[in-house]
Amino acid sequence: ARPKSDCEKHRESTEKTGTIMKLIPKCKENSDYEELQCYEDSKFCVCYDKKGHAASPISTKVKECGCYLKQKERKDSGRESAIIPQCEEDGKWAKKQLWEFNKSCWCVDEKGEQVGKIHHDCDSLKCE
């Protein structure tokens, strides 16, 4: 048998604890952490990256993780000029994205892909 992954070890140790509200990690077949992790008997969820680090706030509103994971990846890159995605509380991409570094903005679709052109008058940009 192959050695247990960090996710599987984390899952086993959590299952043994007697905490009232606990998050028992869900692991993918490839041993990475599932992106959306939810607490037992509760509506609270959180996004994890594949190594098991939180990528979003713990919230009853978090439903998807694509934006939060991209946001964490960019923040962790340490690049000052990195474009940090803006996410809605539920984890969806905010329709209007802003790049502070050069004060530009644009609209995105539900996958975070740019729609239309880049603008510099961000107050007047309306994204539907």
From Swiss-Prot:
GO terms classed as biological process: cell-matrix adhesion
Disulphide connectivity of cysteines: C7-C27, C38-C45, C47-C67, C107-C127
The entry's keywords: Disulfide bond, Protease inhibitor, Repeat, Secreted, Thiol protease inhibitor
Gene Ontology CC terms: basement membrane; extracellular space
Organs and tissues of expression: Expressed by the venom gland.
Gene Ontology MF terms in the entry: cysteine-type endopeptidase inhibitor activity
Matching PROSITE patterns: THYROGLOBULIN_1_2
Domain Thyroglobulin type-1: 4-67, 72-127
InterPro entries found in the cross-reference section: Dev_reg/Prot_inhib (IPR051950), Thyroglobulin_1 (IPR000716), Thyroglobulin_1_sf (IPR036857)
Subcellular location: Secreted
Primary localisation category: secreted
Recorded superkingdom: Eukaryota
Role description: Cysteine proteinase inhibitor.
Record protein name field: U24-ctenitoxin-Pn1a
Species per Swiss-Prot/TrEMBL record: Phoneutria nigriventer (Brazilian armed spider)
